From Swiss-Prot:
Active site residues of this protein: E174, H248, C365
Its biological purpose: Catalyzes the hydrolysis of N(2)-succinylarginine into N(2)-succinylornithine, ammonia and CO(2).
Protein name in the entry: N-succinylarginine dihydrolase
One Pfam family hit: AstB
UniProt keyword annotations, A-Z: Arginine metabolism, Hydrolase
Organism in which the protein naturally occurs: Salmonella dublin (strain CT_02021853)
Gene transcribed to yield this protein: astB
Amino acid sequence: MTAHEVNFDGLVGLTHHYAGLSFGNEASTRHRFQMSNPRLAVKQGLLKMKALADAGFPQAVIPPHERPFIPALRQLGFTGSDEQILDKVARQAPRWLSSVSSASPMWVANAATVCPSADALDGKVHLTVANLNNKFHRALEAPVTEALLRAIFRDESQFSVHSALPQVALLGDEGAANHNRLGGEYGSAGVQLFVYGREEENEIRPARYPARQSREASEAVARLNQVNPQQVIFAQQNPEVIDQGVFHNDVIAVSNRQVLFCHEAAFARQKVLINQLRTRVDGFMAIEVPAGEVSVSDAVATYLFNSQLLSRDDGSMLLVLPRECQDHVGVWRYLNKLVAEDNPISAMQVFDLRESMANGGGPACLRLRVVLTEEERRAVNPAVMMNDALFTALNAWADRYYRDRLTAADLADPLLLREGREALDVLTRLLDLGSVYPFQQTGAADG
C-alpha cells in the first residue's frame, strides 16, 4: 500500500530559555544562563516546516506545553495562588521554576515511538508516549503529550495512542530519538531498530553521562506498538559515545528507508548490527562516517547526524542539516564529498536553528516521523497540517504572544504565565484540539 512519511514538528514554547537542565547534553550545559529569543526560536522552526512542506515533504505541527507548569510546583509543596507560587519558588528554589518552565516539549522526537500500520500486528498506526524519566523537566511532559497526540490522531479505527511506561528508571524511555525504521517503500513492512544505552543485567554502560534508554523499555514499547516480533532488532548504543555527549541515538545516527547514516563508533558491536541489517533489509546501505573524517566530538558539536534524511520522488534523498554543519570546515568538506559519491544522498539543505541548537536540539530533535497511508492521513486532524494559511496564522500568533528576549529571571513574571495561557487558548482553537491543557480543564487560579 502506498504511504508517505509525515514529519510532525514541535512548536517552540513561549518560555524557551537556557537553563542547562540536561546533564549529558553538552550544548545545554554550555549555553546555561544565556539570553534566549523565543520569538526567533519559534520562527526558525516554522521556516523549516514551511520550506520542507513547499518542497513536497508533508509537514504538520505539534503544539507546545503549558509553561510554567504550576501543577508540578504544587506537587512540590508550594501553595497559594498561581502568582504567589511563582513568587515563592523564584525566591526559595529558582531551579524548580526553570525546570517547570522548560520548553523541552518542542523536541518531539522524544514525544513518542511510532509504529506504522505496515509493521503492526493489528494493522493500525501505534504511538507510545515516552516517559522521559531521566530528567525531571522532561518527565513532566507525558500526560499532556498524550492528550495532544489523542487530539491529533483521534480516529481510533486508524490510530492507537498508548500511555507512557511506568515512571521508574528501569523503564526509561526517550521515544523516537532512540528508534529507527529501515526498509523499502514506506508502505511496505520494515525493520524497526530500537537502540538502548543500558539493560539491567549488563554491566556495559557509560561511566560519565547517564544512559537514558533501557532495553527493558524498548522491548515494552515494541510490545505496546504491536510490532511484528520478526521485524525488530534491539541494539546497544556505544557507551563511549554517550560519555562524549551522545545522549540520544539521533545525535550519532539517522536512517531513512534502506539507508543508515551513522558514525563508525555509533553502536556497540556495530559490525554485527550492520550484518544483521544487511540480511534483513533488501538493498540495505550503511554509510559509516570514519572518525578520521569527522570525530565524535565534531559530530556532537555540529549535530551532523541530528539531521533529517528525506526521500524525494525520484528515489534520491535530501539531508536537512543545521547551519553549524556548514560553519565547520571539516564537517562541510565531508558532506560535500558525501553527496558527490554514489549513494542515495544527493542533496543538502541547511537551516538556521541556532535557538534550538544552543539547547541541544537539531532538525531531527524537532520532528516526529509518522508513516501514513492516504486513508490514515485523511484521518489526522486536518488543522495541524502545514500549509500557507497555517504558516501565516502561526507567524501572526507568534508575533502577538512571544517575547523576543527571555532570561531565567523573567520566568517569575506572572504576566508571562498569563500570556502563555492566552496564547495556548488561541492555539487550541486554531488547531481544533479541544481543551488539552490542565489550565483549560480546571480553570487558572491566578489570585
